[in-house]
């Protein structure tokens, strides 16, 4: 049986300052570094060994993966970075303070933008300082592919081709896989893996730095789910 471990990146600097982050590339906070290292220690304590690692193109997820693998003595395993595991793009909300945005638009509207499955936030302009329209890491993508705003539905549509072409084949081959990514890209994967409804997915929380372990049978059906903690 194969195992898949999902880790939301450790606390970021913008988690700490309560800003919408999305595709903006911010670093881990000091607490986030410790969360990532703790995840690695838990992985080692539970005897989890991996054949393949995946992460996004964003520093906070990449560093979380590296800290976790280093702590578990597995920094050497093959690693693939992909934009398809990036956080959900928050559109024009990127960079804004969440509390101030709620005061301006109302708590209910901001909650809908943040958690609704199919409602898009306002789109970001290309000249916005927090746009990725001219970010070099996406230069090989068709410009129309780089999002201006995403909801969870669009995020799932972005993530699924990578699941089908890379992650699922690894698991079907009996490999153990670790993914360090983001709250919403991992919520999208979790929705698919657990067949969670559009309504119920709104309430799913992904804690920073917490490893979630899935065990799959040969048909890629989940036979066990475990969250690692102290």
From Swiss-Prot:
What protein does this entry describe?
2,3-bisphosphoglycerate-dependent phosphoglycerate mutase
EC assignment: the record states 5.4.2.11
Site Transition state stabilizer: give positions.
182
Family according to the record: Belongs to the phosphoglycerate mutase family. BPG-dependent PGAM subfamily.
Tell me the Pfam families matching this sequence.
Answer: His_Phos_1
The GO molecular function terms of this record are: phosphoglycerate mutase activity
Name the gene.
gpmA
One GO BP annotation is: gluconeogenesis
So what does this thing catalyse?
A: (2R)-2-phosphoglycerate = (2R)-3-phosphoglycerate
The first-level EC class reads: isomerase
Swiss-Prot/TrEMBL keywords: Gluconeogenesis, Glycolysis, Isomerase
Q: Where is the active site?
A: 9 (tele-phosphohistidine intermediate), 87 (proton donor/acceptor)
- Which residues bind substrate per the record? 8-15, 21-22, 60, 87-90, 98, 114-115, 183-184
Entry keyword annotation includes Lyase: no
The answer to whether keyword Isomerase applies is yes
Pathway of action: Carbohydrate degradation; glycolysis; pyruvate from D-glyceraldehyde 3-phosphate: step 3/5
Q: What function does the entry list?
A: Catalyzes the interconversion of 2-phosphoglycerate and 3-phosphoglycerate.
Q: Which CDD domains match?
A: HP_PGM_like
Organism expressing this protein natively: Lactobacillus acidophilus (strain ATCC 700396 / NCK56 / N2 / NCFM)
């Amino acid at each position: 049986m194969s195992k898949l471990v999902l880790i939301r990146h450790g606390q970021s600097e913008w988690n700490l300052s309560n800003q919408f982050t999305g595709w903006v590339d911010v670093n881990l906070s000091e607490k986030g570094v410790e969360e990532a290292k703790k995840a690695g220690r838990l992985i080692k304590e539970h005897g989890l060994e991996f054949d393949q690692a995946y992460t996004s193109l964003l520093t906070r997820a990449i560093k979380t993966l590296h800290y976790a693998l280093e702590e578990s003595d597995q920094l050497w395993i093959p690693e693939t970075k992909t934009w398809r595991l990036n956080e959900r793009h928050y559109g024009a909300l990127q960079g804004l303070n969440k509390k101030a945005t709620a005061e301006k638009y109302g708590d209910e509207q901001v909650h809908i933008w943040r958690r609704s499955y199919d409602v898009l936030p306002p789109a970001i302009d290309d000249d916005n300082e927090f746009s990725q329209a001219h970010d070099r890491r996406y230069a090989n993508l068709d410009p129309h592919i780089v999002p201006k705003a995403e909801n969870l539905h669009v995020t799932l549509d972005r993530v699924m081709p990578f699941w089908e072409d890379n992650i699922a084949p690894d698991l079907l081959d009996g490999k153990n896989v670790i993914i360090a990514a983001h709250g919403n890209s991992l919520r999208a994967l979790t929705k698919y893996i657990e067949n969670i409804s559009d309504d119920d997915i709104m309430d799913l929380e992904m804690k920073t730095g917490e490893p979630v372990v899935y065990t799959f049978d040969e048909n890629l059906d989940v036979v066990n789910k475990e969250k690692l903690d102290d």
